Amino acid sequence: MPIRCKVFYGLTKEDEATLFAIRTGNATCLTAGERLRANLVAENPDALYFVGITSNAGVEFAYDGIRAPWKIYCIETAYELYKQYGCERYIEMLNIINEAWRGNVDAYLAGVIRGVTRFISVYEGEYSRERLVQQLARTHPKTITQLAQKDTGSSANRHMRQILRIYNGASREMSLPLKN
C-alpha cells in the first residue's frame, strides 16, 4: 500500500514551522504547546507577543505538558482568554493570580484563570484589587475548583461565582452582587 505524502522544497525554517503548525493534526492532533512552539519558531507576531507579555508577567508556559510553579499548563485556555478579553485584562488576571498565590501550581488551572478573568471583566470598576488579592490568598485555588464543580453553568461562571463568594466573605459593605 503506497503512502501518500507531500514534499515541499525551498522552505525556510520559519516556513516549515508555520506549515507544521497549520498542517499537522490530520493523523495526530497537536497539543496547544506544540502549536505555540511551532508558531514561535515561525516567528508568528501574535504568538511572540502573547508569550512575551505572559513572560513579562512572571509566568511561563508548560510546553512539556508538566505542571510546575509559575507555569501555565492550559496554554489553549490562556490564549483563548487573551483573545477574548484582550491584553490588558489577560495581564491583570496573571498579576492578580501571581500576587495571591505566588506561583502555586493549582492557581494556573483552566477554571481558575477563567474565573479570575471573568470576575475582573464583570466587576471592572467595582471591585477592590487589593481586597481581591487578599481574599484569594486566604483560599487554596484547588478549593475554588472543587466548589465550582458542584455548581452549574459554564466553567468561567462557576469559578467566577466561587471567586465572588470568596471576595465578599463576611463583609456586607464590601460585598458585590451576583452578575452574569
Feature map (PLM): residue ranges:
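Accessory terminal alpha-helical modules
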Residues: 2-180
